[in-house]
Amino acid sequence: MRNSKTNELVLTGLFTAIIIIMAFTPLGYIPLVVINATIIHIPVILGSLFCGPKKGAFLGFVFGFTSCLKATIVGGTLSSFVFSPVLAASLVGTSGIFKSLFIAFVPRILVGVIPYFVYIGIKKVLASEKKNLWGTVLNVLMSVFLAFGVYVFLGKMSESLSQAAALGIGIAVGAVVFIVVEAVFIRKSTQVIPFVYAGVAGAMTNTLLVMGSIFVLYKDAYADAIGVAGNAVLGVITGVISFNGVIEAIVAAIIVYLVGLVLNTIKPIAAK
C-alpha cells in the first residue's frame, strides 16, 4: 500500500512537470489560428488512470492553470480571452472573469476524472460473459470514429481530394483498424479497448466542454474576435470539434494506449 501511494505521488509529480513543460513550449500546443489544438490533456488522462480521479483532477487543475496563465501572458490566438479572466474582463466586463475561469478550469479538471471511470467501466464490461460481443461493439464504434476522423482530416487538408475519395479512404482505414484490432488484440488481450476509449474520452471531454462553453458563454464575443457573424459561430465551433477534436482524440488514444501498456506493467491500474 505504501509503495503504491509513493508511486502515485512520484507519477503525479512527473505528470505535473510534463504538463508545465508542454504548456510553455511548442510541445504542448499546435496553433491553428482560431484556437490551439492541444496534447497537454494526455498526461492528465494518464494521471487519471494511474493515480486515480482525485490526483487526476489535480493534474487537470494544473492544465487549466497553465492555459489560463499562457493565455494571459502570451496570448497567441484570436480566442485567448476565453481562457484569460484578465483579457475577458477588459473585453466583456466583470462577468468575463467567471466565464473564463470556468472554461479554463472545469473542462480540464473533468479530463482528469472521466477517463478513469471510462477505463474501469469498460474493463468490467469486457470481463463479463459477453466480453467478445461487447469488445466487438466497442471496436466498431472506435473504427467508425477513426474513419470519420480520417475523412474530416483529409477534407480539411487536401483541397484536390474529393469528398467521396476522402470518405472512401476513411472507411478503408476504419475497416483495416477494425480487422487488425479484432483479430490481433481483442482475442488475446482486453487492454487495448479500455486504454483507447479512456484516451478518446479524455480528449473529447476537453474539446466538447471547452467549445460548448465558448458557444454558451461567449457566442457574440467569440464571433467578433474571429471575424464572423453571430449566426456562423455554431458552424465554426462544430468545425473545430470535428477537426481539432477528432485529431486530438485519435492522437490521445494511440499515446494513452502505448504509454499505458508500459506503465501498467510497473503500476497496474486499481479500482479506487
Describe the function of each predicted region.
Residues M1-K272:
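Loop-helix junctions at membrane interfaces
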